[in-house]
Design a protein with these regions (language model features):
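Active-site SXXK
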Residues: 7, 34-60, 90, 151-155, ...
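Short, structural beta-strand-to-alpha-helix junction motif
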Residues: 38, 84-88, 144
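Mid-domain, small-residue-enriched loop/turn segments at the edges of structured enzyme/sensor domains
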Residues: 73-75, 106-149
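Conserved catalytic neighborhood of penicillin-recognizing serine enzymes
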Residues: 53-112, 161, 173-203
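A penicillin-recognizing enzyme superfamily signal
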Residues: 1-3, 9-34, 141-332, 336
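Sec-exported extracytoplasmic/periplasmic mature domains
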Residues: 7, 44-53, 65, 92-96, ...
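Short, solvent-exposed beta-strand edge segments and adjacent coil->beta transition regions
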Residues: 30, 97-99, 131-133
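Ser/Thr/Gly/Pro-rich low-complexity, disordered linker/stalk segments of secreted
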Residues: 331-394
Length: 394
């Protein structure tokens, strides 16, 4: 548990049970584990929004897919594909195939690794990790909970990475400073990128794979991301509020398959995160994530991500102003979407002028809920198990 604004680690647990030795193995700082879908946000969608000109409304087709080098990602339900999918939906429901597509076709694994290292992840190996499985958390050396939590804290802190520290200073008996542990800080992403990722990860908690992590005080905003590896060897939830960031890892040192230990309780790590945050935030004032001035809200076509025309199925989405669409969708109609007050002056273009799409937000979002999400990336990463139904394998 850390304060994202200062880098101070406020609480840390290195394991369960009685501590019997000094300087014993600390799983929070020393154990490197496969991160699963927790990597999707920071290895794929962070660089996609920050450097590749994409937006939360950018789309790809969720369909059977093979990368040029022969890698085949699958969603948790290998026979379930959702068709046209936005980046927001891919994050919310932890969708593997389209995430891999965005990494391979737009971001590139090399750029993903650069962003990870800029977020304080020290275990990356470019020669071994710069491949398609990176987007689903398939890496050679794993990652520590401390570093992963620190990476997400940068998103919570408006894009500014602050090195996690366990002490602030050391004084001698007279109060003189012997060691002043000032954390290293730098900008890791644009503030607009951080806010857009936060907005998408709020959906993870409100209706996606992270719903069991919803805290009791709904007046305090909350965002986060789930992660699961093959056969439930590792279960992750890393999330944050405007006050604090926390990361939870569940697993065994010997990678025992928790599929057979947890029964159907695949959400225990999310519930633990919620319980901890409920206690930590007791008595805190309601607070939301503050939207920066370089973000705007637009109504766009749910298929193309362009400004909506009358024939489009539409969604309302947030954009960084420098990547917001400026062209109108011409795929569905030539009649541009306008406010009702201006409708009478619109150019008719297509005489059939289907206007049924202009009056409501009829998006192409995944209505199947958590069943569309999850990880099943092959040898290194597994699936997200989501939602309030603890028996759901998604």
């Amino acid at each position: 548990l850390m304060d994202q604004s200062t880098g101070y680690v406020l609480a840390l647990s290195g394991g369960r049970g009685e501590k019997k030795t000094s300087r014993s193995f600390n799983r929070a700082t020393q154990s490197t584990r496969q991160p699963g879908s927790v990597f999707k946000t920071i290895a794929v969608f962070l660089p996609a929004l920050d450097s590749c000109g994409l937006s939360l409304a950018s789309t790809k087709e969720d369909e059977p897919y093979t990368t040029p080098d022969g890698y085949q990602p699958f969603n948790t339900n290998a026979n379930s594909y959702q068709g046209t999918t936005t980046i927001r939906e891919a994050i919310t429901y932890s969708m593997n195939v389209v995430t891999t597509k965005w990494l391979v076709e737009d971001v590139t694994p090399k750029l993903g690794i650069e962003y990870l290292e800029n977020l304080g992840i020290t275990t990356m190996d470019e020669d071994r990790d710069a491949y398609a499985p990176l987007g689903l958390g398939g890496i050679s050396n794993g990652v520590t909970n401390l570093e992963l939590t620190g990476a997400y804290a940068a998103i919570a802190n408006g894009g500014v990475y602050t090195q996690p520290i366990l002490y602030s200073k050391i004084l001698d008996k007279d109060g003189n400073v012997l060691l002043d542990n000032v954390p290293e800080k730098h900008t890791a992403m644009k503030d607009s990128t951080a806010w857009l990722l936060t907005s998408a990860m709020e959906d993870v908690v409100s209706k996606g794979t992270g719903t069991p992590a919803q805290i009791s005080n709904y007046g305090i905003a909350e965002a986060g991301k789930t992660g699961t590896t093959d056969d439930y060897k590792d279960l992750w939830f890393v999330g944050y509020t405007p006050y604090y960031t926390a990361g939870i890892w569940f697993g065994y040192d010997d990678s025992t398959l928790m599929r057979y230990r947890l029964g159907y309780n695949y959400n225990a790590h999310k519930v633990l995160w919620k319980n901890i945050m409920n206690e930590v935030l007791e008595g805190y004032e309601d607070r939301d994530f503050v939207m920066p001035s370089d973000v705007e809200k637009l109504r766009v076509c749910s298929t193309t991500g362009l400004l909506a025309s009358y024939g489009c199925s539409t969604i309302t989405e947030y954009f960084a102003k420098d990547t917001a669409p400026t062209e109108y969708c011409s795929r569905h109609s030539y009649r541009y979407y306008q406010d009702d007050d201006d409708a009478s002056s619109s150019s008719s273009g297509n005489s059939s002028g289907n206007s049924s799409g202009s009056s409501s937000d009829n998006s192409s979002s995944n209505n199947s809920g958590d069943s569309s999400g999850g990880d099943n990336s092959g040898s290194n990463s597994g699936g997200d198990n989501s939602g309030d139904n603890s028996g759901s394998n998604s």
